[in-house]
Each structure stands twice: as structure tokens, then as C-alpha cells.
Amino acid sequence: MKLAFIIILIYSNTIFASDVTVNELKNKSPERVLYIGNSYLYYNDSLHNHVRRMLEESYGREVDTGNYKLVTISGSRISHHNINHSLDHKNLGAKKPFELVILQGGSGETNSLRERNIFEQEVNVMVDKIHNNGAEAALYMIHAYVEPHEDTSSDMIKNIKKMYIDTANNNNILVIPVGIAFENAYIEKPKIKLHKHYDGNHPSLLGTYLAAAVVFSSVTQKSPKNIKYNYYDAIGDLDIQFLQKIAHETVEDFYSINLK
């Protein structure tokens, strides 16, 4: 029964992969990046810092943190963010306009058809404004709850996939498959801890590292397997190898590409 469940999940991911209409950014080496979201991003020293360190290793140079920003509101949904304020780089102390804006929605936005429609409408407006500001836009597909969260459900990741992929396709933008990477990791190694053990909601350090590796590879189309960054020896070699492997395979399968 467990094997059949795993096969169904893998097949489901394959189906969604074939539905993606955008599989790359025009600019695969952005340095002026804005992340917009909630606590899923800022836990564990913040996802944007981990991605930046991976980019710096890949680029062979430092990324100016003055142009590399994170705007988060605890427990927020897409509609809670003032995109007009954030897109004016001067409001955030940035020196130049952003090249890429990554949008991350709230977990509750997948709860009902009405909420999913509101999410799509809000993203539509935001993406238009991002493009009018000269930047590319991407959606950060969130992960699903796991136990002990009281709302844990196998339907959640299905709704997340559909909402993010449909919305990205309708706006002709990239969707970053973080949620699918979490799912794939749990399928291959059920005992790995990608969520905080006390809530089954927020990412653990391993979860944040996996998410960062997926973002890195989705943006650059380079394999995370080439990255030596291990958060200053805070993450062990075996965990790094596994997380990089999952990120590599997820990104390749999702976009039907070969990472460099």
C-alpha cells in the first residue's frame, strides 16, 4: 500500500511538471533580488541569506546586500503586502531597482476555491506592477503541513501545486517547486526533519537549506551539487548531499531541463 502511495505521488509530480509553461528566467544571474513573503522565508537565518551565499559561491564574488532584500510579515498572505512600496527600491534602502522579485504566499491561501482565486487575482496585479518596474517575477511554491499540525492533509500539496502552477502559467512567470522538493524528500527519506518538530508548519534548518537549494537552481539553472556551502559547518555532509540531490532532481524533473 505504501509503495502504491509513493508511485501515485511521483506520477502526480510528473503530471504537474508537464503543465509548466515557463522553465527559466531571462536573467539567470540576478544580483538585485527582492523576496516577499512571511515566516516561511525568515526562519533559520532567512532563506534569502542562504540563497545569496550559494549565489556568491557560484558567481565567485560577493553580492551587494544593499540590493538584495527581504520583506516579510508574520502570518501574511499575498494581499497583505504593499507591492507599490516595496518595488520602490529607495523605500528599502536599495541602491538600484530590483532585477527579480520572488513572491511567496501564505499557507492558508490554499484552503478554499475562493481563497485560491483571491491569491491568483492578487498575484496578477503584483506581477503586472513588477514587470512595469522592469523586473522579472517568480512564485515560490510553499511546502505543505506535516504532523503534528492539526490541518495536515494529503490534499494540501495537491492544492498548492495547482494554485501556484496555474497562477504562474496564467502570468507567464516561473514557479519555484519548493513544495514538491519537500514532498520528494519525505518520500525518499520519511524520517528526515524538514519542518519544526513542534508545529509541523515552519521549516527546520534542513528545510530552509533544501528550499534555498531549489531556489538557487531554479534561478541559475545550475546544479546545487556543485555548492560547498553548508551554513558554516552547521549541516552535516550526509544531509547536504541528500538535500542537494533532492533539489537537483526536483528542479530537473519539474522543468524538464538538465542542470549544469
Q: Language-model features: where?
A:
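Alpha-helical cap/lid subdomain in secreted, periplasmic
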Residues: K90-L205, S217, N226
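Short hydrophobic segments within beta-strands
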Residues: I36-G37, Y140
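Conserved SGNH/GDSL esterase-like catalytic core that processes O-acyl groups on lipids
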Residues: R32-L34, L41-E120
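Conserved catalytic region of serine esterases and O-acyltransferases that act on ester linkages
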Residues: H202, Y209-K260
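A short, charged/proline- and glycine-enriched loop
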Residues: N27-E31
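Sec-dependent signal peptide recognition
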Residues: M1-I8
